[in-house]
Amino acid sequence: YIDGDEGILLYHGYSIDQLAENGDFLETCYLLLYGELPNKQQKIDFDRCIMRHTMVHEQFARFFHGFRRDSHPMAVMVACLGAMSAFYHDSINITDPQQRMIASIRLISKVPTLAAMAYKYSIGQPFVYPRNDLNYATNFLHMCFSVPCEEHKISPVIARAMDRIFTLHADHEQNASTSTVRLAGSSGANPYACIAAGVACLWGPAHGGANEACLKMLQEIGSVKKIPEFIARAKDKNDPFRLMGFGHRVYKNYDPRAKIMQKTCHEVLQELNIQDDPLLDIAMELEHIALNDEYFINKKLYPNVDFYSGITLKALGFPTE
């Protein structure tokens, strides 16, 4: 449920603030799948079920070698998700509730593995297998950033930030990618094909690509000294330039996800002791201006979730693309 005027986002009656601060992503997944939060035993069983299915078919390793190493990760993800219907064709009957649930479990458990493999392939490092003894977010970061030749420890602050990013993006009513998935599903297409279509839609700069576009804008600005010039351009109706990461088509108030992401972003920067990154300096100054400039306040152009998530993901070590 979304109330754009009041800046409210609820998942089955629970505010996004409650879920992000007091729960975790898999708890949110359970809520979205079953309509209620799990009790202690249900949470243990659900977490165990997800973590036991994180490995992907070994042939996927060969599948990746068909891509150029400089392929955009979203192109790789669309292909991999579509390919899941070939590797896991025992759960593609969309009319069977049990098969739909199996497909849902497989998607939640295996997509982080495929995403990490896409990243590792792009930088020429060996794939890292998932570890069932780690929680969901920590496991994803482990697969992305650990290497076989040395031990890699992940800070709880960093893992918590990743988990919050997952939770904040778990659902957003009838957005473009959700509409795409539902449209594909209306034809009776299998769940993996439907999700692949949704990921293709998510690739667009007006949707999931917004945080990437925001970081590219920060690169275009180049330095803190040039911010006033770009602010003036953003206010000029005749200039095609616009600030990415500010305002939202649904929220006419502060994006509730942005408040959580803002806090998370600053926690990550403090944990990693990042103080001299020029892009982050530009972002922090832009944030300060947007929250104090009458033009932005009157037009309700507050920093949105994409503004903070892009900065946070960059700080965590993910490349812009």
Curated annotation (Swiss-Prot):
> Looking at the UniProt record for this protein, which Gene Ontology cellular component terms does it annotate, in alphabetical order?
cytoplasm
Which pathway is this protein engaged in? Answer: Carbohydrate metabolism; tricarboxylic acid cycle; isocitrate from oxaloacetate: step 1/2
**Enzyme class, spelled out:** transferase
Q: Name one Pfam family in it.
A: Citrate_synt
User: Which GO BP terms sit in this record?
Assistant: tricarboxylic acid cycle
Active site (record annotation): 248, 306
Reaction equations catalysed: oxaloacetate + acetyl-CoA + H2O = citrate + CoA + H(+)
> Could you say which EC number(s) this protein's record lists?
2.3.3.16
Tell me which UniProt keywords the record has, alphabetically. Transferase, Tricarboxylic acid cycle
**SUPFAM superfamilies on file:** Citrate synthase
A molecular function (GO) term = citrate (Si)-synthase activity
Under InterPro entries, the record lists: Citrate_synth-like_lrg_a-sub, Citrate_synth-like_sm_a-sub, Citrate_synthase, Citrate_synthase_AS, Citrate_synthase_bac-typ, Citrate_synthase_sf, Citrate_synthase_typ-I
Other information:
Citrate synthase is found in nearly all cells capable of oxidative metabolism.
| Family under the similarity heading | Belongs to the citrate synthase family.
Extract the NCBIfam families matched here. cit_synth_I, PRK05614.1
User: What PANTHER family does the database record attribute to this sequence?
Assistant: CITRATE SYNTHASE
The molecule here is called Citrate synthase
Taxonomy of origin reads: Bacteria, Pseudomonadati, Pseudomonadota, Alphaproteobacteria, Hyphomicrobiales
